[in-house]
Regions:
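RNase H-like polynucleotidyl transferase catalytic core
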Residues: 20-28, 96-113
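RNase H-like two-metal-ion nuclease catalytic core shared by retroviral integrases
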Residues: 80-82, 102-126
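C-terminal anion-handling pockets and recognition modules
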Residues: 114-180
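Acidic/histidine-rich, metal-coordinating catalytic segments
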Residues: 1, 73-87, 112
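Extended, low-complexity cationic-aromatic segments
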Residues: 1-67, 167, 175
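Short, aromatic/basic amphipathic alpha-helical patches
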Residues: 88-98
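Short catalytic/ligand-binding loop motif for oxyanion handling, primarily in non-cytosolic enzymes
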Residues: 5-8, 86-88, 110-113, 163
Length: 180
């Protein structure tokens, strides 16, 4: 899942010297945020949905999985990150009924393939216009259709075929001495 702003624009732009770069609009849509949920594989996006209000909780995730994943896929490995809504027993039971569930290692951006996908998706969305929920859905569909399959394979290779192994770093936080 990821948060997507209706005005997904770059933070830097060019303007005349001494003039501020401004995007003018009368629409209140620029302040809206949506929650997107995506299921990806090495062959592309399996399914996705965009919610207008609220984040992804266990009930929404179950609804998405039932509608788009567990009803269509069998004997697949479903990888979820460590969000609390993903670790719910109801989620585990639903996925393990016909598939296998695996949780990603504790958060490391380079081992989480979906985060790399979100970065690619959002950078491409920044180049498109459209403020409304409907237009944003069209833009997402457009961006998804233009991402080559090779990119999806590279995302997974980068996350799961890393030459170096994850090594936990020593903690740098110093223990405060208790003088009193």
């Amino acid at each position: 899942e990821t948060s997507i702003k209706s005005l997904q624009k770059r933070h830097h732009c060019y303007s005349e010297k001494g003039k501020r770069c401004v995007i003018k609009t009368q629409s209140q849509e620029v302040f809206k945020k949506y929650t997107g949920i995506f299921a990806i594989s090495v062959d592309g996006v399996i399914e996705w949905d965009l919610y207008e209000k609220g984040g992804i909780n266990t009930d929404r995730l179950i609804e998405f999985l039932k509608k788009n994943i567990t009803s269509k896929l069998r004997n697949k490995l479903i990888i979820l990150d460590n969000a609390s809504s993903h670790r719910n027993e109801r989620i585990k039971e639903l996925v393990n009924k016909h598939n296998n569930i695996l949780y990603a290692v504790p958060y490391q951006h380079f081992t989480n393939s979906i985060e790399n996908y979100f970065s690619m998706l959002k950078s491409r969305l920044q180049k498109l216009d459209g403020l409304t929920h409907i237009k944003l859905k069209e833009n997402i569909e457009n961006v998804i259709s233009k991402i080559p399959k090779e990119k999806y394979r590279n995302i997974f290779k980068g996350a799961y075929e890393r030459p170096e192994k994850y090594v936990a770093k020593n903690k740098t936080r110093k223990i405060k001495k208790n003088y009193l």
